[in-house]
UniProtKB/Swiss-Prot annotation:
Its main location: nucleus. Keywords: Acetylation, Chromosome, DNA-binding, Isopeptide bond, Nucleosome core, Nucleus, Phosphoprotein, Ubl conjugation. Core component of nucleosome. Nucleosomes wrap and compact DNA into chromatin, limiting DNA accessibility to the cellular machineries which require DNA as a template. Histones thereby play a central role in transcription regulation, DNA repair, DNA replication and chromosomal stability. DNA accessibility is regulated via a complex set of post-translational modifications of histones, also called histone code, and nucleosome remodeling. GO terms for molecular function: DNA binding; protein heterodimerization activity; structural constituent of chromatin. This is Histone H2A, orphon. Belongs to the histone H2A family. PROSITE patterns: HISTONE_H2A (PS00046). The modification Phosphoserine is found at S2. Monoubiquitination of Lys-119 gives a specific tag for epigenetic transcriptional repression. Phosphorylation on Ser-2 is enhanced during mitosis. Phosphorylation on Ser-2 directly represses transcription. Residues 1-18 have a biased composition (Basic residues). InterPro entries: Histone-fold (IPR009072), Histone_H2A (IPR002119), Histone_H2A/H2B/H3 (IPR007125), Histone_H2A_C (IPR032454), Histone_H2A_CS (IPR032458). One of its GO terms (cellular component) is nucleosome.
Length: 125
């Protein structure tokens, strides 16, 4: 007697939905939060996977651009200023996050063309 009951089948090791989808973001937690938030009466099985994938992609995109901005400023640590520069210099991210204010982010350096000094032509005799 093996003590496993009738079937004798060994239960497979539990595998998270995040690892099945190849994601780092927690699919189970996102599913729970979608249910708890009362966004809809029912939540499909694919919805939290898709949402986790989108969130992971956006996070990776912003972090990559912010890392580039930090490296351009000769820094090894990403600060809110680098996030601001990364988002505002990217056309699509800027449009997506147009209504977002980043604390301690500052503004993009920009001088209007009319305020710049006029270029005078030097007269050569």
């Amino acid at each position: 007697m093996s003590g496993r009951g009738k079937g004798g089948k060994v239960k497979a090791k539990a595998k998270s939905r995040s690892s099945r989808a190849g994601l780092q973001f927690p699919v189970g937690r996102i599913h729970r939060l979608l249910r708890k938030g009362h966004y809809a009466e029912r939540i499909g099985a694919g919805a939290p996977v898709y949402l986790a994938a989108v969130m992971e992609y956006l996070g990776a995109e912003i972090l990559e651009l912010a890392g580039n901005a930090a490296r351009d400023n000769k820094k090894t640590r990403i600060i809110p200023r680098h996030l601001q520069l990364a988002i505002r210099n990217d056309e699509e991210l800027n449009k997506l996050l147009s209504g977002v204010t980043i604390a301690q982010g500052g503004v993009l350096p920009n001088i209007q063309a009319v305020l710049l000094p006029k270029k005078t032509e030097s007269k050569k005799a």
